[in-house]
Amino acid sequence: MMRSRFLLFIVFFSLSLFISSLIASDLGFCNEEMALVGGVGDVPANQNSGEVESLARFAVDEHNKKENALLEFARVVKAKEQVVAGTLHHLTLEILEAGQKKLYEAKVWVKPWLNFKELQEFKPASDAPAITSSDLGCKQGEHESGWREVPGDDPEVKHVAEQAVKTIQQRSNSLFPYELLEVVHAKAEVTGEAAKYNMLLKLKRGEKEEKFKVEVHKNHEGALHLNHAEQHHD
């Protein structure tokens, strides 16, 4: 009889410790552990980009509520994640602040099984250059000066191409809007705190396909300007 009671006590005590540790974790008493569980790594390629953008918008909204600010989300520049008691998302964001584009860094802690989401940090990326390697669609570690080829499917390159198409449309008298089909070829160059893009774009207008050579400049504030555009004939 005594032995059975002793065994029951051991089982009950073990369960109590386990439940207490879970409660402490869920209440957020694990900040020290968060930094120790896993290193920061790239977001998996198969992760939904819409999910990352949703976290980015959440971070901006939460910051605006807490600080009574009016920052506007523009795009996700870079996303990394860290396995903790859940996942800590490290985001570099392009933000519109009083009409000017600026870079911010945010950390969002997510525990999906509890439907828990919390903004841990939101600050200006003061040490980040205005033009980064990701702005040129280049791999980290590439530092050669001058013009270099960049992938046409890079998000930043596509963003620049789409802005160029919008400007071409604004300057056109056509009733049919231009649609970007493909970035056929792209080169980029960093000059000081600005960047230049030379691209060959395949566009569609109505049933007709056309190619345009464009040169786009990006200044230190992130503003894009279509410097030159002409039709290209193969």
From Swiss-Prot:
Biased composition (Basic and acidic residues): 140-154
Subcellular localization(s) per the UniProt record: Secreted
Domain Cystatin, chain residue ranges per copy: 38-126, 145-215
Signal peptide: 1-24
Record region (Disordered): 133-154
One GO CC term, this protein: cytosol
Cross-referenced InterPro entries: Cystatin, Cystatin_dom, Cystatin_sf, Prot_inh_cystat_CS
GO biological process: defense response; hyperosmotic response; response to cold; response to oxidative stress; response to water deprivation
Residue numbers bearing the Phosphoserine modification: S174
Keywords: Acetylation, Phosphoprotein, Plant defense, Protease inhibitor, Repeat, Secreted, Signal, Thiol protease inhibitor
Motif stretch (Secondary area of contact): 82-86
Annotated site (Reactive site): G38
Tree of life domain: Eukaryota
Pfam family membership, one: SQAPI
Keyword Repeat: yes
MF-aspect GO terms: cobalt ion binding; cysteine-type endopeptidase inhibitor activity
Gene3D superfamilies: 3.10.450.10
SUPFAM superfamilies named in the record: Cystatin/monellin
General function of this protein: Specific inhibitor of cysteine proteinases. Probably involved in the regulation of endogenous processes and in defense against pests and pathogens.
Family: Belongs to the cystatin family. Phytocystatin subfamily.
Family annotation (PANTHER family): CYSTATIN FAMILY MEMBER, CYSTEINE PROTEINASE INHIBITOR 6
Name of the featured protein: Cysteine proteinase inhibitor 6
